[in-house]
């Protein structure tokens, strides 16, 4: 079910060990360290294979994440804001990744621009608690969603390329 490129990307992301969410104070700090280490490794691997496609940062508590993601299509870079909150029941519950500016532009999205991950990603996440983290959500959730939805939205004329600096 997972293509070779995704399998290769996934194999380069460290698995997490600490089963802790935002309510777990000291354990959450340890989990956040693991999350950052996995994200850093994933970004390094992406850059090394010329597949760099997102930047993320979080608030001090590690409960709100935000940044940019982009998708290259026909030699044009389409860039989107990305955001999500860490659920209180994390890591049992996966984060709901949102691309607010695409809200309402595709059927594979919930209110607020949250991308639909129920059919393929959520069962996989559930089988891999607590080993999967934010980097895995990006690799197995957002990346495939962008690969399917962005070209479709472009072909339908729902989104169009904008030069940097133009509005």
UniProtKB/Swiss-Prot annotation:
It comes from Anopheles gambiae (African malaria mosquito). Keywords: Ubl conjugation pathway. E2-like enzyme which forms an intermediate with UFM1 via a thioester linkage. Pfam families: UFC1. The active site is at residue 116. Transmembrane segments: none annotated. This is Ubiquitin-fold modifier-conjugating enzyme 1. The keyword Lyase does not apply. The keyword Zinc does not apply. GO terms for molecular function: UFM1 conjugating enzyme activity; UFM1 transferase activity. It comes from the Eukaryota. One of its GO terms (biological process) is reticulophagy. Belongs to the ubiquitin-conjugating enzyme family. UFC1 subfamily.
């Amino acid at each position: 079910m997972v293509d070779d490129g995704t399998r290769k990307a996934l194999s380069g992301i460290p698995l997490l060990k600490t089963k802790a969410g935002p309510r777990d104070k000291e354990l959450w700090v340890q989990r956040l360290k693991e999350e950052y280490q996995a994200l850093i490794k994933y970004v390094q691997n992406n850059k090394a294979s010329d597949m760099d496609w997102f930047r993320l940062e979080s608030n001090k508590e590690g409960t709100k994440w935000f940044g940019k993601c982009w998708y290259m299509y026909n030699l044009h870079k389409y860039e989107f804001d990305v955001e999500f909150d860490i659920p209180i029941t994390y890591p049992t519950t996966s984060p709901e990744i949102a691309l607010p500016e695409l809200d309402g532009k595709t059927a594979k999205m919930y209110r607020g621009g949250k991308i639909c991950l129920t059919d393929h990603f959520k069962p996989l996440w559930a089988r891999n608690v607590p080993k999967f983290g934010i980097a895995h959500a990006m690799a197995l959730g957002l990346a495939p969603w962008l690969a399917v939805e962005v070209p479709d939205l472009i072909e339908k004329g729902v989104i169009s390329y904008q030069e940097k600096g133009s509005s």
